[in-house]
């Protein structure tokens, strides 16, 4: 499982060092894809394939589901962590997430998110108060 917030720097070649505590769970391969809120999502390869199969099975008759699966599959990039603990973020993924040198990597329980640092700070500013107040229905499910 993935927990925590980290602020690695991305180099000019689009390489980003993943937190050491995430690497073991991603050692068997990983998939980078476009995530929600213009972030990137990193899944362990086996988790991504399982979710993609479920999504594809549900998408045959629903136009919105088909569009989701197309975007998910078209933006998926299979990778492995290099000997220095890095992955390379494609130019298209960098564009989608607005990534530059300053990045934020967060654990989202069963996957990892990569954010533009400014976008993450803005997201936190917009959502932190409702989290603190317990306004979210998901919060109630957690309790």
Swiss-Prot record:
Hydrolase among keywords: no
Cited Gene3D superfamilies: Transcriptional regulator MraZ domain (3.40.1550.20)
Compartment(s) of residence: Cytoplasm, Nucleoid
Glycoprotein as UniProt keyword: no
GO cellular component: cytoplasm; nucleoid
GO molecular-function terms, A-Z: DNA-binding transcription factor activity; transcription cis-regulatory region binding
A single GO BP: negative regulation of DNA-templated transcription initiation
Entry keyword set: Cytoplasm, DNA-binding, Repeat, Transcription, Transcription regulation
Database matches in CDD domains: MraZ_C (cd16321), MraZ_N (cd16320)
Domain of life of the source: Bacteria
Principal localisation: cytoplasm
Domain SpoVT-AbrB positions: 5-47, 76-119
Family: Belongs to the MraZ family.
Subunit structure comment from the entry: Forms oligomers.
Protein name, UniProt field: Transcriptional regulator MraZ
Naturally occurring in which organism (per UniProt): Corynebacterium kroppenstedtii (strain DSM 44385 / JCM 11950 / CIP 105744 / CCUG 35717)
Lineage start: Bacteria, Bacillati, Actinomycetota, Actinomycetes, Mycobacteriales
Gene that this sequence comes from: mraZ
């Amino acid at each position: 499982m993935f927990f925590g917030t980290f602020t690695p720097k991305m180099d000019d070649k689009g390489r980003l060092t993943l937190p050491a505590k995430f690497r073991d769970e991603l050692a068997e391969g990983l998939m980078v894809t476009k995530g929600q809120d213009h972030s990137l999502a990193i899944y362990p390869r086996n988790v991504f394939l399982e979710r993609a199969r479920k999504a594809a099975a549900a998408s045959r008759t629903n136009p919105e589901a088909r569009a989701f699966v197309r975007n998910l599959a078209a933006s998926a990039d299979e990778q492995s962590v290099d000997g220095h603990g890095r992955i390379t973020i494609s130019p298209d993924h960098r564009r989608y997430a607005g990534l530059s040198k300053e990045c934020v990597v967060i654990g989202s329980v069963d996957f990892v998110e990569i954010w533009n640092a400014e976008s993450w700070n803005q997201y936190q500013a917009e959502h932190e108060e409702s989290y603190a107040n317990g306004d979210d229905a998901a919060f109630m499910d957690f309790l």
